[in-house]
Amino acid sequence: MNVKTVKCPSCGKPVPWVPESRYRPFCSERCKQIDLGAWAAEQYTIPVVEEDDLPDAPGNDTSGKLN
């Protein structure tokens, strides 16, 4: 059987993608905690698109006028 592997997001070590891999996608509890700490310290961010930057779409009129 060919087992798929993924790289641990913290250290890059290969991790077999099977139910027995307790911390997947991480290789260990330590790498899992390092990643959680990075999120808690706001080292990772999710990009936000400002509403002014969104293209105009039909039905998205925010002027308050009714058609």
UniProtKB/Swiss-Prot annotation:
Binding residues for Zn(2+): C8, C11, C27, C31
UniProt-listed PANTHER family: DNA GYRASE INHIBITOR YACG (PTHR36150:SF1)
Molecular functions per Gene Ontology: DNA topoisomerase type II (double strand cut, ATP-hydrolyzing) inhibitor activity; zinc ion binding
Pfam family, one: YacG
Function: Inhibits all the catalytic activities of DNA gyrase by preventing its interaction with DNA. Acts by binding directly to the C-terminal domain of GyrB, which probably disrupts DNA binding by the gyrase.
Subunit comment: Interacts with GyrB.
Coiled coil region boundaries: none
Family as reported in the entry's similarity comment: Belongs to the DNA gyrase inhibitor YacG family.
Record protein name field: DNA gyrase inhibitor YacG
